[in-house]
């Protein structure tokens, strides 16, 4: 945590004094001697040095001071609280006794609270568990206690302190007179000044939700000591005089409160200036002076830094509690972890508590518990991704600060903390369960229900009384608490606090009662028993707490003290956090009638850990309105369509057929904690591990080889190792038995046609859906997953075995990884799928069924049985059915089944689910195992059926030639695209019609009609032929048996046939649509950024990269590339860059093929493939694919004919290929273009390739690193380290043109320019001296960081001085290549030039650079070299980045031209 000492004017002088005391008592004494007139803080540098050099001694000293402070504060408190007690007539002695802490115990606690309750954070779930240790147990690494201080030492130090305080008092009285005049001025200036200071120096953005404590150091003592009036005025201005707590305090505590009220805001810091009843307050303040510390907390939540001039109850150490912000009325409870001693247990705040609460016993109680509270807070809230951060949930961006939170909220925070502590402490009192007795405890809880454990209170409604009389089991508390909240608390704040706190116990206490306000009170005790055991709330830290969380749901029923004005989404968020699907369902059911669900509520729900259960609920119960709410809410979110895809799923039970769909759908116990925004890495949310894998019928059936996580940013659709060695032989008979015991056959085409046109109305809803280009480019993964869902009962509807392969690969990818996480899709998703399915189905499945070899399938038969029996049965049945049974989803019976397999499984499983509803998981598993046997038998039946159908398929295959003859006229494209849209609209219309109507079969049939009758003919296919042979008859299970592979083995069937065909047809016909699809088929995905369509990630299997079309068949790859390039001028769906991307993607796959074959590993992966294929591989390996001849003859020719200079991205993963191209087709490859540097950066070959670039004076021209922003700085540092290594050549820099990445750029550049170039002329820099440091910095990720990293290996250091001239010969160039954006023509840069592209933003900079001829050359990207600019014009209008570059990166330029530019007005914004 970063602590900066700066001085807010209204952070009163006490801060400084306390800090001083904490840092070094001796220094404080010295400062008194040296400066008699005023107390002066050490400068920031001094304190920093002291901290860094003397941390250990400092900690000890701080501890001694703290202990002593406690003692003093106790005395003060006793004397003060006696007075206050007189005025507080409402306090019952009885209640006080409950909270009375014996003095001895209190001292022990103060001495070392370590042995009390310790709070442990689970880094995964960010839930907090409290372990109750015996007092005898001492926790290791107690950072809080420091060295315990002997009483003698304490007494001595006390005396010293008191003397010091007397001195201070005298000095301050003198100061008072001098400074009174300036006070008013200070009041006015205070706010501005503090903000300015913050902006200039002290705001540190911290992305981890840490709080940054900024204690401002003020140089002018007069400013340090504003009077109370000044402060109060300020507060009034800031708070608009309407802080209810102030009035309340005055009312409740009469005269004393007036003092206390002032103190509350002042927090006892204006010791010298207390003008309210100066005598008494002053005494106390002088004593307390060293005991309370105030600081300004700047909370850096994620992106935004909220600078609040806040008075906080905070110690001066690395600790923070709640800060009450005067300026924006916001409170932060973010506390960094306690470190290095300090006031971690709140000792310094003790006097403040006493002031606030006016009673020593309550103060002691808070004081006693403060350490646990603080630690709890620091742990809970620190975690950057606590379960449902408000910011993400809202989708509005970051929540900067909570609004309308004032002092009463602080009180509430304390109360919650207190309650939290009491709850933890009095576990047994509160009917919490003990470790292991889940079931028994459930019963007990139900019995005890009559004694709900709330924060029960009696007495007056003042917050003091409320807090003083808190008793967990006091039955009279309801009204008090309710009125308290009504009077003092912003309901939103309470819920936000609870959300932030993420304390399940507290939340449930509050929530349950709150919910009861929404409904007639009923006891629902017995409902949750079964679920409790299953849904352990993700709090796996400690059994006690887990069980408690689960079982507590039953206990709280009748009391409610919140009222109903809380925002629904907040409340719902809290409910979701509890992880109890039952409670959520009750809310969804409308049990709490006034708790209206709005869009954001549903949005939360569908991002929570309960997402899958909620979706199931929505679908099973046909809750159309909820899904609509979600769709609406998603408009707040970027990429809502994709997000929607990742979330919504189709009715499980209705899914027309397979049990599998049902089983997959209805899994209820899914712990998918998915980050609300799926990372770009997997561009489709569906694929990210976060979203629970969509379960599709096949998914369950087909074991998948690759897990999701392995998926690169786009899905190389290609089977990992698939070699598609199958030759395309259109006429070769196809051994795919069209076996389909097919209960429901699609109507014959002719009938369909008539119905089709009569029934379908075209309703344009295109605007909601992505345009055709993106349709084609729509993520293939989603297509695959949804494809299954689209035709749930038609596993037979497959695109070919190749389709099946893809489906398996994609859909199952996930099931392996998340065995239990099956999910389902809604028709909305289906619609998106259709866009692709269409394309795919059409083209792939249909046209191309016939062309492939018999051999492909024969060898794979061995594995099918294993797959079906093991994976299909166990995974699907056990996982999904168990969940179904537990959660009482018994809709399975409704499904109709297509194949015998599915039917039997369905019926068997559904029956089981009825009987086993309430049984434990174990029983369910056994039942399902029995079902597995049934499935095996069924599979055998299917095999027989399939064999019978072989003949039919052969006939169909012969017809393929007809299809091939249907050429597509590219000129028709536009016209066809219009039709295309119309068809999609029809589909959408259908979707609307059937959405949630559980008419899947009808829907499916209609869709098929669309597919085959309207859509496919657009591509010139023979619709009748298609319809008849549309793969509908081929049963998926059968295909799996025939062509499946063993799960977990890398061996897979040959590459997707469909790909081959699509690619083939796309370059035969040069059809843009087909091509677009084929591109996606082999895994290139469109980026959302638009300008960069494709990424080139790798799938690494067995240390081998696989990617691209025709994996392993270089000839076909090149053939396809040929077809692509021949037509590269004519693509209508892709712009120039996209065409480049396509070609590069193909190149990439070629590279990978070459690389894989060179590694000779393909054979191993294809153990079970045909011998023919293996032989092919061997031949290829021997020839090494004749890389040179291939490139010379084909690629060189092709690229030469293409008007586009292909970038080197796709070459990056093969150093051989880079070298080859560099030597042989350098004129065709743009080596300055390295968009995939992101992949490169993570690639093990990063160094070798960069070295190659450096050796050859190549440079990374237009690099855009696709890296998360959080990594940018580390990458900059990494690049910096490479810069050391390669300083004689080139420093690769990857830059975006946005502000944040700009910093990355400036960071790296700053180091180089300032430290290397401008410490000399660049010739005196010798890399040799830095080699060791560079290597160490690499391994540690540049451990030195930005502050210290700068000093390493400067050319002017003594280490380098001996070698200054070693590297100055002409051959070694020190090239610094900067690109902010824009394309540039590569060239070798003369020594010490800085290379910048032409860029509108940077024109001014280019002008400036051009005038420094000796160092810079202006080189616009497309115009050639020209540096003949006139002298710079005056008045360049700079933006922030430009100013930053000019001032900090090129300070010499700044000095030279600083009068020539002005900064834009919004510079600081």
Curated annotation (Swiss-Prot):
Q: Where is the composition biased (Polar residues)?
A: 719-731
**Annotated source species:** Dictyostelium discoideum
Q: What is this protein called?
A: Putative uncharacterized protein DDB_G0280555
Look up the domain of life of the source.
Eukaryota
Q: Where is this region: Disordered?
A: 146-186, 231-255, 306-344, 430-455, 520-560, 654-706, 719-755, 881-958, 1329-1369
UniProt lists compositionally biased (Pro residues) regions at 732-749
The record's listing under PANTHER family reads: MANSC DOMAIN CONTAINING PROTEIN 1, OXIDANT-INDUCED CELL-CYCLE ARREST PROTEIN 5
Q: Where is the composition biased (Low complexity)?
A: 232-241, 306-327, 430-449, 523-559, 654-693, 1329-1347, 1354-1369
Bias class Basic and acidic residues marks the residues at 146-180
